[in-house]
Amino acid sequence: MNTNHIRQVVIVGGTHGNERIGLYLVKKFNQDSSLLFRPNLTTNCLIGNPQACKENQRYIETDLNRCFIKADLDNHLLGRHEEKQAKVLHEQLGPKGNSENFLLDLHSTTANMGLTLILVNDHPFNLHLAAYLTHHNPQVRVYRWTQENQENAFVSSLCQLGFAIEVGPIPQGILLASLFKETETLIHQTLDYLEQVNRGASPPLPKTLTLFQHLEVVDYPKTSNGELAGMIHPQLQGRDYQPLNPGDPIFLTFEDQTLFYEGCSTVWPIFINEAAYYEKGIAMCLTHKQDISLK
Ligand SMILES: [Zn+2]
């Protein structure tokens, strides 16, 4: 793949129909294509799941952002709404793993994630761009959601280049002007970098990048019937990206009993109390904070 010249940038909003910031940014950009114009860059915007956006629902039948496993994309027996929509997007933006596009997938979260880039691979191009963005925008954090021997199923996994942008906290189904504008700025900073690459320039970069590497997901306490038995502990609520040490409070049961983190080392939880993850059995994702040096 030629990383000295980005063929096309694709910005996807509304992959989840109740995440309105990405949807309305894409609508805005599509109304006036001059907004994203860079002389050496071609940028297109599209809505990931138009039907779900119309209904202001995360999805119609299943989570679109878990439908991009290669075998599933090739399996024409899978005919639920999002499984079909994934094949449409794959046709437009793929083929998965070999696409020359740079993909930005816009999301929002009810968790206190600030501005997060979610990387789904280790491509040096993405790490360099992430370092550039954290340097120019110190609010930006970088989360790498890779798991050994496990294929990623996100929209953003269609292309080697690019990532998802996850912003929060924001309730589902609404807009917040502050996060809307911060996301828009981040998109412009990304395009500025890509424009420099296409002009043949090498934007100056910091030598290291701080990233939060995915470790594992943690479920809520449950009864033997699988019913919720507790909530995020008030001392943990909203503390995404803050260190959680062994013995720190993590959940509060409905009987007012505090449950403590029983791991053996410090972790950095994120996606704490994300509304869409209750059905997935995810109360938070644990990460390890690390500094990596850039080559
Ligand atoms: Zn989302």
From Swiss-Prot:
Gene3D superfamilies: 2.20.25.160, Zn peptidases (3.40.630.10). It holds the Pfam family AstE_AspA_hybrid. Binds 1 zinc ion per subunit. It comes from the Bacteria. Its EC number is 3.5.1.15. Its cofactor is Zn(2+). Zn(2+) binds at H16, E19, H107. Transmembrane segments: none annotated. InterPro entries: AspA/AstE_fam (IPR050178), Aspartoacylase (IPR016708), AstE_AspA_cat (IPR055438), Aste_AspA_hybrid_dom (IPR007036). The keyword Nuclease does not apply. Keywords: Hydrolase, Metal-binding, Zinc. GO terms for molecular function: aspartoacylase activity; hydrolase activity, acting on ester bonds; zinc ion binding. Substrate binds at R58, N65, R66, E166, Y277. SUPFAM superfamilies: Zn-dependent exopeptidases (SSF53187). It catalyses: an N-acyl-L-aspartate + H2O = a carboxylate + L-aspartate. GO terms for cellular component: cytosol. HAMAP family: Aspartoacylase (MF_00704). Belongs to the AspA/AstE family. Aspartoacylase subfamily. This is Probable aspartoacylase. It comes from Acaryochloris marina (strain MBIC 11017).
